[in-house]
Amino acid sequence: IGSYNHLLGRCAESWMASPAVAKRLSGPFPKSLDGARILLPTDDTAIRVALDQWLDKQGVRPFIVGEFEDYALLREFARHGRGVAPVPEVLVDQFRKESGLVPLGTAGKVRAEFYAISMERKLRHPGVVAILEKASDVFDSA
């Protein structure tokens, strides 16, 4: 079965934590992540590779306490104070309002990518086309 990826957009990756975890971090961001308990996407994803490279470039050695395949579960662990979590910038306001997480900073030039996956090369369904068009209002052009 063939499928086609249609890029919806890219956005910066932010780091968020519960207020209690954020208070325990010391020093300026991103050095405050050194030794901190963090929650990450699984290591077989492009965003994880980019985050690992960014952390290494910052000279930061966090303590990885969990790896997740979806942001909903990652958010719940962060909400319950289990660690600092990377969050796509487009979800920061939602995570702040719904989970009480606070932003700590962004991961430099690391970008999360979002795709619509379809069975058609050229999208025809009006609803899917509308989503693709609206995505440019949500995502940055980086």
What is each of the regions a protein language model found here?
Residues Y4-S14, E89, K97-R111:
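Short beta-strand->loop
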Residues K23-S26, A36-Q58, R124-L132, S141-A142:
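Secondary-structure junction motif
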Residues D44-V102:
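Hydrophobic hinge/microswitch elements
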Residues V102-A142:
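A late-sequence structural motif
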